[in-house]
């Protein structure tokens, strides 16, 4: 188990380097900074952030491998004995400059506690304007990986999990058009072979670029004006609301004395809240809102 954890940590670190290389090249206007840090309780990580780019207004790709003692109220809800834990993973959020390019998030992680080891992760897409082809492409790329690793990769289940997880109850809408989400893979009734789980997670990590980058490059040439930019900033407000109120990773990090700068890296650089603003009926903004609910983008149901 210890060997698999170390291999996972190494893979996530290598994936961080590769993603930053590819994303900086795609941006063409800025580079990622690198900030290595140590956690007082044990372990550390590397935060890599690109700001003020041509394609990305802000992009962050974090890697960490930490260990320590969990608070009792968290430990009792997790698999394994005791309160000692180890966690490694990669987390990324890309906030594009153009409102025609969707924001995206992905993370892949491995945790151990007592005799339990499990994987978690996923990837999701948050557009500001709806392009159906983009949603289909993103979902199809992830579904192909899941199908290749069935039954461990269960696209239909992970997609439904994503729709449920990335939901803002106080707004009555999903954060975006979804993707996949999974947790406790290898624990809580999913006793899959560890090596096969790791193969699946590695394949997913490598699929992120082909799932997202063609969308970003295609939409970056779309024209937009002040109306679209204002809409983007308002919709970013929903992103902030979810991350600070509901996101499990954010709350876990804050409750385990995590590094605040890394935890809040996911927040966009600019955002706005305007009082009681509604999308105009029949507008492209209204079209997006109408699709912020579980949608069978690949028409696999039935």
Question: Across the structure, where does each feature detected by a protein language model lie?
Answer:
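Compact, glycine/acidic-enriched structural inserts
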Residues: 114-158
């Amino acid at each position: 188990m210890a060997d698999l954890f170390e291999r996972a940590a190494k893979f996530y670190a290598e994936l961080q380097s590769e993603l930053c290389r590819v994303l900086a090249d795609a941006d063409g206007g800025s580079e990622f900074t690198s900030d290595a840090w140590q956690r007082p309780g044990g372990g550390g990580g590397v935060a890599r952030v690109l700001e003020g780019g041509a394609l990305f207004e802000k992009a962050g790709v974090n890697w960490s491998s930490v260990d320590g003692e969990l608070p009792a109220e968290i430990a009792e809800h997790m698999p394994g004995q005791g309160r000692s834990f180890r966690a490694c993973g990669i987390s990324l959020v890309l906030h594009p400059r153009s409102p025609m390019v969707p924001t995206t998030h992905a993370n892949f992680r491995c945790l151990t506690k007592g005799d339990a080891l499990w994987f978690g992760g996923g990837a999701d897409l948050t557009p500001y304007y709806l392009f159906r082809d983009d949603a289909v492409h993103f979902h199809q790329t992830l579904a192909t990986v899941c199908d290749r690793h069935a039954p461990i990769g269960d696209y239909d289940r992970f997609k439904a999990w994503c729709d449920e997880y990335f939901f803002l109850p106080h707004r009555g809408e999903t954060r975006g058009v979804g993707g996949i989400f999974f947790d406790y893979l290898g624990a809580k009734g999913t006793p899959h072979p560890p090596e096969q789980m790791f193969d699946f997670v590695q394949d997913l990590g490598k699929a992120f670029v082909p799932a997202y980058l063609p969308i970003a490059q295609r939409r970056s040439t779309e024209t937009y004006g002040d109306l679209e930019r204002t809409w983007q900033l308002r919709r970013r407000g929903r992103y902030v609301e979810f991350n600070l109120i509901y996101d499990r990773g954010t709350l876990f990090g804050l409750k385990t004395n995590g590094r605040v700068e890394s935890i809040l890296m996911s927040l966009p650089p600019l955002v706005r809240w305007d009082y009681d603003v509604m999308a105009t009926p029949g507008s492209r903004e209204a079209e997006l809102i109408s699709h912020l609910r579980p949608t069978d983008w690949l028409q696999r149901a039935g």
